[in-house]
Amino acid sequence: MAPPSYLVHGHMTNLLTWLATSDDHPLVTSCIFHYEFEFIHPFEDGNGRMGRLWQTLILSRWKPLFAFLPVETVIRERQEEYYAALAQADSAGESTPFVEFLLDAACGIERGRYFGYGMHCSRHRSS
């Protein structure tokens, strides 16, 4: 559930400040930002598209190749999972389920290739 409209400005200010100062890996940062943006829900319509656009922007500033990869298409193809991951994260009260889904989706774009900084996508998941 989105916060009341009078809190949106403060939440967005905090989110953008966090983005500017985050030391997390850009893949993780982009996913957390995307989730928090969706939670804040600053617009009446188009929040999903804007969240995905922000994620692409964050990733492409890290690795310009992301500006040309079909992140939006992959998420659209897995739309039910996308919304389920959002709901699961909302229920859990934290972004981990959504971050895990988005990282898996990003790995699906270029399965088996290195994204840099020692991160490698693979089909193997630890339990």
Model-flagged regions — what are they?
Residues 1-127:
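FIC/Doc superfamily catalytic core
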